[in-house]
């Protein structure tokens, strides 16, 4: 079935976007487990509750996980990734990303670019930065990779 341009198809907690690259899309998930994929343009994707998988694809995306054990992929562009309560995996990809974990034991990978990573939640998080000049604000108990150039413990 072909989906007309700029339409959102919702089927069993699966959202598929098809749009022109120059336009931004705003997508909200459900209280269930969602698989939300953005477009080549800038997107705002909010997974809400559930164990969600969010992927931005291109441009400068905002991905918000919400409660649950979420996986967020920024891909290309200068993205903003925000975890939430739960054990999240946050992957920035190429570009200078802003990544913030939430309550839970998160795994954060900045990827290529000058990333800003925040992981101050009082639980053990694992952080890797990748290429670029990265800044990390982390708890004293967090495991921070040696490839993170500037690390501040709080």
Which residue ranges define each predicted feature?
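Glycine-centered beta-turn/loop sites at beta-strand termini
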Residues: 29-32, 38, 47, 55-58, ...
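Bacterial N-terminal signal peptides
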Residues: 10-18
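Leucine-rich solenoid repeat scaffolds
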Residues: 119-154
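Sec/Tat signal peptide C-region and signal peptidase I cleavage site
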Residues: 20-26
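Consensus positions within tandem repeat domains that build extended binding/scaffold surfaces
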Residues: 33, 42, 51, 60, ...
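Positively charged n-region of N-terminal signal peptides that target proteins for export
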Residues: 1-8
